[in-house]
Amino acid sequence: MTDDESESVLSDSHEGSELELPVIQLCGLVEELSYVNSALKTETEMFEKYYAKLEPRDQRPPRLSEIKISAADYAQFRGRRRSKSRTGMDRGVGLTADQKLELVQKEVADMKDDLRHTRANAERDLQHHEAIIEEAEIRWSEVSREVHEFEKDILKAISKKKGSILATQKVMKYIEDMNRRRDNMKEKLRLKNVSLKVQRKKMLLQLRQKEEVSEALHDVDFQQLKIENAQFLETIEARNQELTQLKLSSGNTLQVLNAYKSKLHKAMEIYLNLDKEILLRKELLEKIEKETLQVEEDRAKAEAVNKRLRKQLAEFRAPQVMTYVREKILNADLEKSIRMWERKVEIAEMSLKGHRKAWNRMKITNEQLQADYLAGK
């Protein structure tokens, strides 16, 4: 069944059940038909584009999108299509899937070519604009440099010598030098342009000769080229196989290299741990050596004290018993006398405090009497 027949059957079934369906289903049906119509429209435009490439412009039939008909004509055309679909006469033959696939592939290839041309044009325009920007930057740098030189060489001298003839001559000389340099630059650019034109002519001539030589190739040359192409393809296949083998060997080498790298990483970690442990052991050894030196010093001091004590012990002579008893009794008597004198001193201090208080009272009383006496006079 073709697209026209399916569309006519759908339209008949939709018209027959249009009064029976609710509004929601009608909206869904309209949306579905709109999607189908948009897909068919895109496909029809692609077919018309391909058909337009095959036929000359004067022999092309008008496109469906270019045909402008009224609503009545469209209804009449639709009714005529329905009658044709009902009778089953004059059915058009649709495209097969392979033909549609071929058309789509050609359309995709054309789109890729257009995209490539567009990209090439865009790159060329971009390079052109970049060259213009670069030239503008170069010109701007030259103008800035010339302005700086003019300000440094001319304006400073003019500001110092206003109204003098030397300043005017200097400006004129600067302008003449600038014109001379510009003429020299113009001549260089003209010569370069001439040489570039000559090179362009040579390249065009070589290209034309190559095209003529390529057009003059015969069947024998094409057969030779086919043979060489086959040989090159065999060589490329062999090189691809070698490249595959090299990739496999490279993969194995990378695996071995990764294994050795992991081993090296582990060895480096062990080395770092051992290095840290060696540093800790060295610090511990230095600490032990310091403690050993301190112990040696303490031992030497203890030996010296021990020798001194032994010497004192050897020289020590205990007193006799009676002498010791007498000294002990004398010591006890002295302690008793010390305690007795301490009590006497405390008693004397207390009596001294009492006498001081009495003296202070007497002194205060005397001062009051003197004050009263002086006041009575």
Curated annotation (Swiss-Prot):
Signal peptide start and end residues: none
Localization per record: Cytoplasm, Cytoskeleton, Microtubule organizing center, Centrosome, Centriolar satellite; Cell projection, Cilium
Pfam family, one: CCDC113_CCDC96_CC
Keyword NADP: no
The entry's keywords: Cell projection, Cilium biogenesis/degradation, Coiled coil, Cytoplasm, Cytoskeleton
Principal location: cytoplasm
GO biological process: cilium assembly
Keyword Coiled coil: yes
Residues forming coiled coils: 95-243, 280-354
Gene Ontology CC terms, in alphabetical order: axoneme; centriolar satellite; ciliary basal body; protein-containing complex
Subunit and partners: Forms a complex with CFAP184; the interaction is required for functional activity in cilia. Interacts with HAP1 and PCM1.
Family annotation (PANTHER family): COILED-COIL DOMAIN-CONTAINING PROTEIN 113 (PTHR15654:SF2), COILED-COIL DOMAIN-CONTAINING PROTEIN 113-RELATED (PTHR15654)
Family: Belongs to the CFAP263 family.
Protein task: Component of centriolar satellites contributing to primary cilium formation. In complex with CFAP263, acts as a regulator of ciliary beating that connects radial spoke 3 (RS3) to the inner dynein arm (IDA) and the nexin-dynein regulatory complex (N-DRC). The complex is positioned parallel to N-DRC and forms a connection between the arch at the base of RS3, the IDA tail and N-DRC.
Protein name listed in UniProt: Cilia- and flagella-associated protein 263
UniProt gene name: CFAP263
